[in-house]
Curated annotation (Swiss-Prot):
Coiled-coil boundaries: none
Record protein name field: DNA repair protein RecO
Family in the record: Belongs to the RecO family.
CC annotations in GO: bacterial nucleoid
PANTHER family: DNA REPAIR PROTEIN RECO
Pfam families: RecO_C, RecO_N
UniProt lineage: Bacteria, Bacillati, Bacillota, Bacilli, Bacillales
Protein task: Involved in DNA repair and RecF pathway recombination.
GO biological process terms held by the UniProt record: DNA recombination; double-strand break repair
Keyword terms of this UniProt record: DNA damage, DNA recombination, DNA repair
Domain of life: Bacteria
Amino acid sequence: MLIKSEGIVLRTTDYGETNKIVTLLTREHGKIGVMARGAKKSNSRLSAISQPFLYGTFLIQSSTGLGTLQQGEMIESMRTIREDLFLTAYAAYMTELLDKGTEEKKPNPYLFELLLQSLRHLNEGTDADIILFIVEVKMLSVMGMKPELDQCVHCGQKEGQFHFSIRDNGFICQNCFSKDPYKLPLSPAAARLLRLFHYFDLSRLGQVDVKPQTKQEIRQVLDHYYDEYSGLYLKSKKFMNQMESMKKLMGGENKS
């Protein structure tokens, strides 16, 4: 059966001398793998539409296993991302997170829209750290491991200062700080943003200015939480961390 669907290229894997296996996140059919025959050839009509992060419409011959990609049409190439090594690192991490955090052939229009809006923002120059934070926070709910971000996990307090307890899965208020000696400190701004990221509609995001220290606090919480509960090992995470370290070094050189 032939199906036509909007999709985003999550990853490609070389298969034989000339073919590629392309993993797509589609709006209508969820995550699916397709064989793109001849896509490794530069003159192939499938080569251009099997580029990482590309958003397009795809005509697929479906089957019980791998489908076959018959043809496709690009809607947005996300070329700016692919031409920037730093943006590529961020986008690769986001797509691998969605790839590893979702099951095949289970439609989820919300996830599709989340990835599409995230890639668009990256492509248009929105702060990459903020985009990534939003995706990571929202993916916690998708994977069934959302922390408590609305109130203290112990007493239900909704106002005041909060830190984050990895052990207890969420915010703890200052009255309960003693219950977790290993809590991670959060400024009021970092706590507010973590809560906001869970509910925020990415399509409404404009330019955001967040202090480096606040970003560092949020990054620490998300890294520890994912390490503790997700069970995921993402190769792209290491690459992204290397790019972040390089960016800091380059920034330091510019300031000196």
